[in-house]
Each structure stands twice: as structure tokens, then as C-alpha cells.
Amino acid sequence: MQLPLALCLVCLLVHTAFRVVEGQGWQAFKNDATEIIPELGEYPEPPPELENNKTMNRAENGGRPPHHPFETKDVSEYSCRELHFTRYVTDGPCRSAKPVTELVCSGQCGPARLLPNAIGRGKWWRPSGPDFRCIPDRYRAQRVQLLCPGGEAPRARKVRLVASCKCKRLTRFHNQSELKDFGTEAARPQKGRKPRPRARSAKANQAELENAY
């Protein structure tokens, strides 16, 4: 008699506990591996996706690496270092009375804002980036006076000096001098014109006539 009475009391306590849970608004317990939070409900709504979410694991830019901010195809955005060089102009034994100053275009080309005298320097060069070289851009003419030894009268001479430099993009056809033939036989034929047959000389025609008889 005591065992059935104890079982009835246990069943009554369990039933009372379920009633209390349902009275507080909780959902029924489920025998699965999913935890149900009463405040969110059985099927919680996903949080809104942020527009500028860069942490998501998704392909961007079509699977290509992002555009490097310092790699540009516009040659005007590149600049090279201009070195000032002072020298005397000579013409045989004569030499200029005063030295002249011109620019020497040298160094590696890079973005103008990343030059050594600019603010915000950084590493911009990449192996896959385009190749540029520094070449003279504009020239200026200057007249100098040459002094000659031996009591000769001074003479004037006009020299051409570099005024500014620029960057030029290299192509895959540069530095391929071994593919070029600088001989006279490698002259390219002009397009649209047919080669003219060479006129026979009078001596060759006379020899043919003599052999005919």
C-alpha cells in the first residue's frame, strides 16, 4: 500500500510542476537537442544584416584581389626624383665663364604623394605592378659665354638643358634589341606599294642580242 501511494504523490508533484510552468507562459518542453528561449520564441527572426559588414565570409571583387590604392595606370599620377646637377660647358679648350644648372632624371618612379619629400610615405611597389622609368620631359635653351686661353676672343654658345622630368611606362617590347636588325637589308617594305622591277642595263641587252645570232 505504501509503494502505490508514493508513486501517486510523485505523479501529482510532476503534474503540478508542469501546471506552474504553463501558467507562467513558458513553452512545452521538447525532447530534442534544440534549446528554446522563452523570450525569443520557437523560431527567432535572424538579426538584420549590416550593409558594411566586412567580416562575412563571402567572395568580393569577383574573387580577385582588391584594387591597390597606389597602383594606377595613369602616368600623370607618377613622378620621379629630379636631381640638380651643376657643370661647366666646354668646347675644346674653351670653357664657360659660369657653371650651368640642369636636371638629371634618375631614380625609381612612384606616386607623387609618396616621394621622399612628400607626407605619408609608404611602401607602394609590388612585383605585379606596372614598370615606369624616369626620362626628360621638357628642355630649355640657354646661351653661355665661353672663355678660351691664349688671348682668343670669347665666344657664345647655345646649349640645351633638361628643364623637367616625367615617368614613362615600359612595355614588353622595350629592351629587346636582340630582336632588331639594324642592317641595311632589314629595311621594311612600304605598305601599299609594289616593288618595281629593276631596269636592265644597255650592256646586258646588247649581250643578249649578240647571243641571239
UniProtKB/Swiss-Prot annotation:
BP terms from Gene Ontology: BMP signaling pathway; canonical Wnt signaling pathway; cellular response to parathyroid hormone stimulus; negative regulation of BMP signaling pathway; negative regulation of canonical Wnt signaling pathway; negative regulation of ossification; negative regulation of protein-containing complex assembly; negative regulation of Wnt signaling pathway
Residue ranges, compositional bias (Basic residues): 190-201
Substitution effect: residue 167 to R: In SOST1; leads to retention of the mutant protein in the endoplasmic reticulum; leads to a complete loss of function of the protein
Signal peptide extent: 1-23
Outcome of mutating residue 21 to L: In CDD; affects protein secretion
Phenotype when changing residue 21 to M: In CDD; de novo mutation; affects protein secretion
Keywords: Disease variant, Disulfide bond, Extracellular matrix, Glycoprotein, Heparin-binding, Secreted, Signal, Wnt signaling pathway
Residues bearing attached sugar chains per UniProt: 53, 175
Positions of disulphide bridges: 80-134, 94-148, 105-165, 109-167
Domain CTCK per the UniProt entry, residue ranges: 82-172
Molecular-function GO terms, alphabetical: BMP binding; carbohydrate binding; DNA-binding transcription factor binding; heparin binding; molecular function inhibitor activity
Tissue: Widely expressed at low levels with highest levels in bone, cartilage, kidney, liver, bone marrow and primary osteoblasts differentiated for 21 days. Detected in the subendothelial layer of the aortic intima (at protein level).
Annotated region described as Disordered, given as residue ranges: 41-71, 178-213
GO cellular component, one term: extracellular space
Chief location category: secreted
Secreted is among the record's keywords: yes
Physiological role: Negative regulator of bone growth that acts through inhibition of Wnt signaling and bone formation.
Similarity annotation: Belongs to the sclerostin family.
Subunit relationships: Interacts with LRP4 (via the extracellular domain); the interaction facilitates the inhibition of Wnt signaling. Interacts with LRP5 (via the first two YWTD-EGF repeat domains); the interaction inhibits Wnt-mediated signaling. Interacts with LRP6.
Disease: Sclerosteosis 1: An autosomal recessive sclerosing bone dysplasia characterized by a generalized hyperostosis and sclerosis leading to a markedly thickened skull, with mandible, ribs, clavicles and all long bones also being affected. Due to narrowing of the foramina of the cranial nerves, facial nerve palsy, hearing loss and atrophy of the optic nerves can occur. Sclerosteosis is clinically and radiologically very similar to van Buchem disease, mainly differentiated by hand malformations and a large stature in sclerosteosis patients. Van Buchem disease: VBCH is an autosomal recessive sclerosing bone dysplasia characterized by endosteal hyperostosis of the mandible, skull, ribs, clavicles, and diaphyses of the long bones. Affected patients present a symmetrically increased thickness of bones, most frequently found as an enlarged jawbone, but also an enlargement of the skull, ribs, diaphysis of long bones, as well as tubular bones of hands and feet.
PANTHER family in alphabetical order: SCLEROSTIN, SCLEROSTIN-RELATED
Name assigned to this protein: Sclerostin
The species this protein was found in: Homo sapiens (Human)
Lineage of producing organism: Eukaryota, Metazoa, Chordata, Craniata, Vertebrata
